[in-house]
Amino acid sequence: MQEVAANKPREKAGAHTMARYGFQVHASILKILEVHRTGADYRAVFDHFDDLMMLDRSEQPEKVGFFQIKSQDKGEWTLAALTAKKGKSKPATFLGRLYHHMDAFGVMVSCLGFVSNLGFKLKLIDGTETTADNLVIPSSQLHPDVMAVLRGAVAKDGVGNTAVDGSQLFVFERIGLGLIEQDKFVKGALVEFIHEREDAHYIPVISLYETLRGSVFTKSGVTEEFTTEAEFYDRKTLSRADVETMFLRATSGRRFLDNWGTIAGDLTANGMRSRRMIVLKNSCILYIKARSVGEPGATAFNAAARDIIIAHQTEIDSYETLPEIVAQLEKWLPSDYEHREGALYVESFEAIG
């Protein structure tokens, strides 16, 4: 992974348009959800070497899939369109750019995926042509004549002479994501995904969508080269654990607000008046939102609070009310974080149980 982080990426995100980003970001989220629901470990890498890389492990990966994510207003992807030259730089074709990764990654490559909102018009091994029902078309289903054209195209593109033949790794995929109302489509996919989880009741879909979209969008836009693996992971990737953390943060924030009535009862018994309570609740909400989107101050406070809570869990478990826990956490955790008071209450609430 150190070589991947330090290597100069082929894709440079700053040169691409916002319109392209919209489809690419949303398609990347859908691919993340697809892999995440299998239970497998992974690390997604955005706009580094290609539109999307999917590593089979978050640490020390053995396999990597590459994806070109392309959107069009109308039509379908024919063999001629897939092998047509785009621009003057080499490799000049979509498939050549995908196959180019065989040079650098060889046997590590598990998939060379071409993902689009449009369908494909390709000849299948039985002599028939693909239809709208063919959503995922691996190379193994394509006619030998088509495979010969694909191999010839990447050879002309100057990337066909690799030590490992990657032509059988091509996969052509049509996804349901369109060019309009992409946010609604992905939110719908999130709803389906969340319903499969035990904590579904507590996860706010819109908040989770905004967090995922914002994270993928930001990481796609980073164009620098990296000197450390840790920096690369932080700025350009999302792992399974990272996405789970997003779910947990969204869940815990919802649970805190759902239990505000109980919390308010403790605060009232402790002598807090309504005006003061409203200010506190707003501070809690601001902290929950800041933490859910990965705001540095909020994540730093969260990390520090987690360490202290783990170190003092036995003592924390001995307290009967939330204000008692807050009072102790305030002593243990000196900080000038702007939403400190709300953060103390949220972290203290999550420390219970």
What are these regions (language model features)?
Residues 1-17, 70-347:
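Acidic metal-coordinating catalytic centers involved in nucleic-acid phosphodiester chemistry
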Residues 14-18, 24-85:
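Catalytic centers of nucleases
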Residues 351-352:
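Generic transmembrane alpha-helix signature in multi-pass membrane proteins
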